[in-house]
Amino acid sequence: MFLADGAGSVSQGGEGATLAVNEAMAYMSQKVQGGELGLNDILATDIVLTVRQRLFAEAEAKELAVRDFACTFLGLISSANGTLIMQIGDGGVVVDFGHGLQLPLTPMVGEYANMTHFITDEDAVSRLETFTSTERVHKVAAFTDGIQRLALNMLDNSPHVPFFTPFFIGLAAATQEQLDLLPKLLKQFLSSPAVNERTDDDKTLALALWLP
């Protein structure tokens, strides 16, 4: 699972986010086909370098600065062999290894309160934060900063459990037909007045369960 959120202050932030996610997915597809993966910092760094290479190439092709494609970047890879989480920027990845929801990596903030870091930054690789576990994740919810105030208890950056619980209950109980409707229902929820009263930013939420 990969998420990216384009910087609102640049001209190609949305395209940068799309390119980042697509490149990460393509890279992982190749790695999976190639055999067993090591879920470690090396893999996370390789993914970030690959994404950066794609963004730099796109910027050069369009004769733009790479900062015009600035975006945050979050990723989670989990298998029976373990779990790897990676992050550059704000937003978060909430997981449950069977012991309750937790936020292994804290959303990044920049020099000022409303700033963060981007995968296009010169120091992005050194800013990259990772979390590894030998356990397979049971539940995961990844989100961009647009719903950070809904998803987290801001005092201690812990998951706001009542926000996530209905989603996971719905996922676990859904039929295939209902699963096909969930993206539309999720979009309606994220666009609802109740949510928009709490945030005026773009909102992305990705959910997954490991089914027995």
Stretch-by-stretch model annotation:
Residues 1-212:
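PP2C/PPM-type serine/threonine phosphatase catalytic domain
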